[in-house]
Amino acid sequence: MADLDYIKNRIREMSLTSMLSAANSVQNRSNVSTVHALFDIAKCGIKYSAGYTDYLNNAFETKTPDERRETITRGVNNAYVRKLNSPDLDSCFNDKRQLYALYRDFISRDIMDIEKASADNLKAFVGDNVKIVVRKPDAKGNDGTFVLNLFGVNDFENLRERLLNMGLSLAERLVTQHREMERLCGESVAVIRVVTVNNVAVFACLNSVYGKLKLTAPINEKTGVITSSALDQQNGMFHRHPLTDRRFYGFKIPLWHDVISLAERASLVLSSVKYCGFYIAVLPDKPELIDATSFPRHDYYRVCDNSVLRRKIEQRISNEIN
């Protein structure tokens, strides 16, 4: 049974319009009525701590009560975070400047704090590069992060002022991906997301952004091989990458053992944060940490066998306690 605080918060946050939209989606893909779906979504929110997005992502209308109980829902994921991570360290992950300092041993790309730099410093940082990455210090994932094309830019005083006015106070070198990653994803942004529990990798996926599409494909964390086709934000399936036409299934991520090693070594940095998500790029000769979070997003778990992952996570928690 979900705890009362969670239920009260979810009821407060619930949007009837969104719930009706979710119920209509369930009706369109199954034989149940919209009214039945709406009541079932509400029931699952209370009984399994599942939001309507959980319901849609995990096709709850097709699951038995036992299967629903075994699914990692929003409430279950929140419980993992509360159990394994100290909230006192949230600020380390919410401010990229603190984050980069904390994980500096896993970051090799040049990074500049534009607030502390002059226009001449910014010009020197850009150098001959046509593109750089700019971020808000509190950026979450790809939100608040942009690739900036500087072709023809000569007024760096104006550029600096405009960036700061938009809150984009961090500048970074654009990383060069491994050739094999480019063969799969082309020039689209691609990162490996690795989740660790008690310093051991339990989940991995590829995330490739192409235009408005955000494609996610599961990776076997032991072998580095993609185990199925990719899903987009609406759970549409992509057997091939739309930019390169290469198959997702069966693709082996290069330098895989180095990727997992980086994530597991990085998970040791903060002993009181035991449930971590690491976002890693694969460069030509090594992996590079791009971002980290103390609140791994559970919606990525929809691409794998969710119940198997839940047992794996809870076994890691149990092993540590015992």
What are these model-predicted stretches?
Residues 151-233:
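Phosphate-binding site of ATP-dependent enzymes
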Residues 132-159:
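Glycine-rich phosphate-binding loop of ATP-grasp-fold ATP-dependent ligases
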